[in-house]
Amino acid sequence: LFIPMKPDSPYIHLHERKRTWTPVQVSAGQLLTGGEEVVQRALALRCLEIPVGDFIADAMKGDLPDIKGCKELLASNVIDEEKHDIALNFAAEAHGVSPQFEAEAERIKKAWLELDRHPVLKAVVLERSVFFVLLPIFRFLGDTGLRTTSADISRDEQTHVAANTLVCEELGLKSDKELNKLRRATVAWVLQSLKGEDTSKHLSSNFWMASSDSLYTRGKAEGLLSTRASRMPAFFETNNVNLPQYA
């Protein structure tokens, strides 16, 4: 009887679960009516992908848990962020993002860069309670191309959040009021065009903010449970250019 060997550390276990994928150019399809501006703002925040990678690269120069596989996994996660940036740039090119939103997103990025906190802590707050709201926004308000991009990035981000949470626990890093305030302000900016409540929960700003709050405090959001299964678009209903490509 063959019994598979258990990985030497949780970092190695996470690394082994990764799946390789290739960013593809997408075409613009139909967005959910009423959600167009939210998608534009969420796409503008793609400018945070590279800084998150930089936060992790920065952390690798200092103290990290002396656990097998930790540095290798974090280095691999930095490369993922570059890939996410390429994939989201393809989506932004397809849909077009207003220069006003791009400029405002850059100011939000500046606020995250200037906040003096441990880089892994900033990364985990962004990934867990901002990116994991933006990705379901692409899925529920977006088109086929955005849903595919969201699914590919989500798989990576699950690994990133798990790894960065482990690092924060090992180093005794905890979030605080300032970080939480910036997290809420970032999500609120994305949701500006939505009413608090709407007949469609996905067009309700309260739904998305409650999801971010829950992800921040508890690491999960019941309202987003339906996004856990990687729902892939059916091949017969999809333009080939919008289908996932696995290396």
Enumerate the predicted regions with their spans.
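Non-heme di-metal
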Residues: 2-247
